Amino acid sequence: MKNTIRLLGSTAALLCSMLVHAQNDEDLVTYNGEAGRVINENCVVCHREGGIGPMQFETYDQVRPWAPLIQIMVTNREMPPYAYDHGIGIQNLQGDWRLEQEQIDTIVAWVNQGAPLGNPDNFLPPPQLNDPSEWNFVDELGEPNLVIPSIPIDIPANGNDLWSTHYVPSGVTQNRCIRAIQVKPKGEAKSVVHHANSSIEIYDEEGQLGRYGMLTEYAMGKWGELVPKDVCRTFPQNSVVRWGIHMYPGGLGTTAPGTIIKDNVVEIGLWLHPKGYEKEVAYTQDLKQYSIQFQRSERETKLVIPPNGYQMTQGFHSFDHPVRIDSFQPHGHLRMVAASLEIFSPKTGRTEAISQISNWSATWHHSHIYEPDIAPLVPTGAVLVLKQWYDNTAANPNNPDPDQWVFGGNRTADEMTHAWLAITHLDEAGYQKQLKKRKEQEFLSLSGTASP
């Protein structure tokens, strides 16, 4: 009888152990399961052979040693490198790299369980990626219709900041509307080109070149720009592109080569709408630099950050007609740590938060592109409020020397305070039409009726 009881007890214990083990297997997060999919879909695009990431994450053996660091970086939302605050302002963005909380929880659970591989026979298929030198929009738009290169520039292995200003023909023989645009430093130039601005100049009746407007802006880490389908961002015929390129010898970031780069070329890739597209849309978009507190001419004397101190700037802009804000890209250098965009209504006295970036970094300049159906509509007379914050203390990990006075200027060691905004210019009828459309969509959404 005692032996029978012992046998039954042993069997029960074994069954309990098997049930617990089965439950644990069901709860186990593995690389060959969800964890690897999160990494492949969000990390490998940079962390691969030839990519800009400092280590490769293409296989389990490559990922496993870095698992604890991956957990820290995704938990702190430092990776993927897309600093944009959750829960403040507009959250629907095109090209949003932020992980969903469920994806972060998956990585955390995987690492806490020892970062297991999982069933080796059920291996994760390798990610299908384009060549790192390929254009970013090639999958959805194909190859660009037009590529405009800068002149070749030699960049030394070390030394002071360098600038190049030069002109190249656009190659555009008929007015065209821009669909998308990307600036791409070639090869190792990615880590030494701080920014590359390009503007459009056209000839007047006397044959003299004059400024038409911005073509695009590039700063380190920027992915590109998408233009809404309902507007025309014009590239005029027979124009000239004025390049303004700022280079930092030796480079910034973990993949900086620290060697001389021969014949560095920066390229602009342009995806264009078909000829005559401007006749199909009613409004135009432009990209401009909006100063914050100080105009460029006074920045070098009035923008001052003391040693081991802080600074904050604030700028205000309004329009004599309604507009739509299509994208927001703050700009600064090594001491800048945060930025925001708000809209103040003089009629109501209320301020609406649009975008907040509380962990901004000079190595990743993102153009935050709002989804067209929720991009901020700004009535005539409303005020855009732009703010930026600076930290010149040792607490700022990007700060090379907190004991230095920092002034406004063009060098990497100096500071800037402005934002790039892509604006669609409306008239009152267009503004009211878009407001009405959004109210109708909101009603359909609340009523559970699908939008046509």
Residue map of PLM features:
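Extended, polar beta-sheet/loop recognition surfaces of beta-rich domains
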Residues: 65-78, 259, 398-403, 427, ...
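His-enriched metal-coordination microenvironments in redox/metal-binding proteins
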Residues: 133-419, 426-429, 442-446, 450-452
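Short, charged low-complexity linker/loop segments at the C-terminal edge of domains
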Residues: 115-119, 276-280, 425-437
